Amino acid sequence: MREAENDDMIVPQLNASVDDVEDMDIYDSTGRKIAEVEAVVIDGTGTVRGLVIEHGGLLGIGSREAILEIGDVQLKDGRLVVNMTEEQLPSLPEWRK
C-alpha cells in the first residue's frame, strides 16, 4: 500500500477528494476529536484502502501514525466519524512509509 498522490482523486466511500480528506479531524461517536488524517492509502490497483491517521501526543510530539481502514470511517455532517474511542487507536496497525 502507498499514499495517494493525486489530490483530485475521489475517495468513493466518503464522496470527497483526497485533498478534502487530508488534514480532516476524526471524531468518535460522542463528538470528541481523537485523530487527524495525514494521508489516503491506496493499493496497487488504485483502490482506496484506508487513511493514515495521527493520534496521541501533544502538538505532534509523541504522536503516532496508524492505518484506519476506510470501512471504519463515515462522513457525517461534514465530519469524519469512527465507532472507536481514543483508547482503541493504539491497537491500529502502525503506518510505515
Residues covered by each model-derived region:
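Peripheral interaction segments used for macromolecular assembly
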Residues: 1-97
